[in-house]
Amino acid sequence: FHCAWPANRPGRRPAGAALFGAFPLAYSVVLEALYLPLILMLVGLIFRGVAFEFRFKARANKRHIWDKAFIWGSLVATFFQGVALGAFIEGFKVVDRKFVGGTLDWLTPFTLFSGLGLIVAYSLLGCTWLIMKTEGSLQKQMHDIARPLALVLLAVIGVVSLWTPIAYPQIAERWFSMPNLVWFMPVPILVLVTFYGLLRAVARDAHYTPFLLTLVLIFLGYSGLGISLWPNIIPPSISIWDAAAPPQSQGFMLVGTLFILPFILGYTYWSYYVFRGKVTHEDGYH
């Protein structure tokens, strides 16, 4: 975790700038429609960052405060990220390229369930990461809770997969119409196969396989989302081409991306390489 923490921060700012520069219409609509959940997500991330840094400087009798701040910051950030994803699936009310919905349009049972579902998904991801990076009693504890978490996540995916086409006919039409059906059909099959492999890996106390298979599950989930919405970047009707910036702006951003991206990837690779292997009691954050 101590290598992933500084390594994942440089990608957030370029990602936001890329959305603003390459798809300004998407940036303006999404930001206006999801202003409150995105702000709360950022507040959670701020709590995480502050707690992570200050815990190691606090006295022993005060560290529990920063532990709780980190836990709640993580939960809030993850929950509202899931809420935003759920609202994205539901779509936005757009007229003449402007958001015309209400401030709380994002607050629905589906989005709240999506927020809870993402907490389960990221909990499993963190659990399997600890299986991969730790040893001893902590690793055994994570092995014990990985299977229940995986089964809960499977139930969440099942509920979302049924709820989405029933509640949103436009998505059902995308799922079950050609050629989208051809692209979408492998996703649920691969999800079930991956879950089976994950449960088998956890049962035999594997170290690395559970985390890798959980990554595959997360990738399949976002792949299903992409297939469900493609080619729209602002559901239900604004396509990626309608929201794109002029070619000159995209060309300018491409030059900057080609320059910056290798540094980010190189730094991330180097961080993971340096901190490869198991974390022991003697290791610490400095």
Regions inferred by a protein language model and the residue ranges of each:
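Juxtamembrane helix-loop boundaries in multi-pass membrane proteins
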Residues: 1-13, 38, 64-78, 140-151, ...
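Divalent metal-coordination and catalytic microenvironments
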Residues: 125, 229, 271
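Membrane-interface helix-loop-helix modules in multi-pass inner-membrane proteins
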Residues: 4-74, 95, 171-182
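Membrane-interface capping segments at transmembrane-helix boundaries
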Residues: 199-205, 266-282
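Long, contiguous internal "core" modules enriched in hydrophobic/ aromatic residues
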Residues: 54-207
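Short, membrane-exposed interhelical loops at transmembrane-helix boundaries
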Residues: 234-253
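...captures the hydrophobic TM-helix bundle architecture rather than a specific catalytic motif
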Residues: 12-17, 37-44, 48, 70-86, ...
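Transmembrane alpha-helical segments of integral membrane proteins
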Residues: 49-56, 196, 227-240
